[in-house]
């Protein structure tokens, strides 16, 4: 029997049979996979600790035609403490849902895995969660190839715009002459902040600061655009109204 090693974070868990779980795990080596964690719900199971969302571990898998099975695993980093705070649970669930929605089974994207781990680490260390989410949204769009055009009008290619509008339909900014009825006017400050985040290395993202007013605009812009890209609602957004 062949053993396969991979490092990954559990995105979701679903109870299976009497004492097991089916885990959705995002790994660097195998991409997003589903794996059986057999008997992990038993009290003394050695797989219990690694079979929960927000746990980053090194796994050893075996594979049948149908599914991976976890042979053994050891925790590298636990973000489970985040779930002790209701607000942070909602924020982290949002990040997880975006990853799970953008990444297909067996699709690899190490940039997004690093982004997710970095973002969860920032939440764990007390970074402003709204800022973490805005950064995550922008970087996610870059790493998946859906980042909009912000440097010139997507229709006429004019740059240095006096007034800037965002076209959700055309995935980028448009000038006053090219704008349509439902396009959203945004300030130069919004565009500049997006481009700064886009150009900043993951290791330096903790230095980014976003004011409350700017965050509100970015949140509307990014969440609306992401829902259009995914062609579905992001369910966890409904829970943001409960955040204090």
Swiss-Prot record:
GO cellular component: bacterial nucleoid
GO biological process: DNA recombination; double-strand break repair
Keyword Aminoacyl-tRNA synthetase: no
Keyword terms: DNA damage, DNA recombination, DNA repair
UniProt KW DNA damage keyword: yes
Parts forming coiled coils: none
Pfam families per record: RecO_C (PF02565), RecO_N (PF11967)
InterPro entries membership: ARFGAP/RecO, DNA_rep/recomb_RecO_N, NA-bd_OB-fold, RecO, RecO_C
Cited function: Involved in DNA repair and RecF pathway recombination.
Database matches in PANTHER family: DNA REPAIR PROTEIN RECO
Family of the protein in this entry: Belongs to the RecO family.
Protein name listed in UniProt: DNA repair protein RecO
Gene this protein is translated from: recO
